[in-house]
């Protein structure tokens, strides 16, 4: 299953705040505003199309119209092919809002074709790039995109290292417990580590860091596993819906995986 390019109608149905051209009445008259649709049009000129959108809060007309939202872009011409045949698409994630509370921010991500799962890259080379609305220009955007693309060899090198590292059973358990700690925080939760480490698909079976990382990342972010909460109640973990939390969780998991690379 691949991601398809979203039309304006698709975007409006899933995250109408993305297409909002106005600004919140709470901002001052001096506030300089760059609507997200302008950024989308500029990204399309550079060959990057929208494949996913999300927004904070309700999607009803007028509700949260100016709140934070996330747009995921992909360029079909930019793709990473591994030696074992796996296809990974680099992505660019844009977060923005029309309430005057934040600049728009770009991050790098990866999309695994094998499981339609998205990862957020969290390295010194791929730190989030924030741009103020005031003074925005197409040339600045072009420079940001080119900068991210130029760093792709670093991503390929990192993914190759992930594939070369073989984890012991103890290390896999350690990784899973650390990931659960990131998901549930100090409150903790009783979870079957075996369930977290059990691959969803045959392609992810193995002891390579890359495979273990993807298995755990998918479970921790998408949920679906049983756990006992600190209250003693049995629950089923839900998928992370808040995209800000999802990005944060992904970044922390990526950093955790990197800690296993010598």
State the predicted function of each range:
Residues 2-3, 77-262:
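Intrinsically disordered, low-complexity regions enriched in serine/threonine
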Residues 26-27, 53, 144:
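A broad "ordered helical/assembly scaffold" signature
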């Amino acid at each position: 299953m691949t991601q398809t390019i979203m039309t304006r109608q698709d975007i409006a149905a899933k995250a109408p705040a993305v297409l909002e051209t106005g600004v919140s009445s709470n901002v001052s008259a001096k506030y300089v505003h760059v609507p997200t649709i302008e950024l989308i049009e500029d990204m399309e000129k550079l060959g990057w199309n929208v494949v996913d959108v999300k927004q904070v809060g309700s999607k009803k007309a007028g509700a949260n119209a100016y709140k934070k939202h996330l747009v995921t872009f992909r360029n079909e011409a930019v793709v990473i092919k591994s030696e074992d045949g796996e296809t990974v698409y680099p992505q660019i994630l844009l977060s923005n809002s029309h309430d005057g509370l934040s600049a728009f921010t770009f991050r790098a991500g990866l999309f695994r074709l094998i499981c339609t799962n998205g990862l957020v890259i969290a390295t010194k080379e791929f730190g989030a790039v924030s741009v103020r609305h005031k003074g925005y220009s197409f040339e600045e955007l072009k420079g940001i995109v080119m900068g991210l693309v130029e760093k792709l060899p670093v991503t390929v090198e990192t993914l190759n290292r992930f594939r070369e590292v073989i984890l012991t059973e103890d290390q896999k358990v350690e990784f899973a417990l650390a990931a659960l700690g990131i998901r549930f925080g100090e409150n903790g939760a009783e979870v079957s580590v075996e369930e977290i480490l059990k691959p969803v698909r045959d392609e992810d079976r193995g002891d390579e860091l890359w495979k273990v990382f993807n298995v755990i990342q998918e479970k921790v972010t998408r949920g679906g596993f049983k756990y006992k909460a600190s209250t003693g109640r049995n629950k089923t973990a839900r998928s992370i819906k808040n995209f800000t939390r999802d990005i944060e969780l992904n970044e922390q998991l990526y950093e955790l995986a990197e800690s296993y690379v010598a």
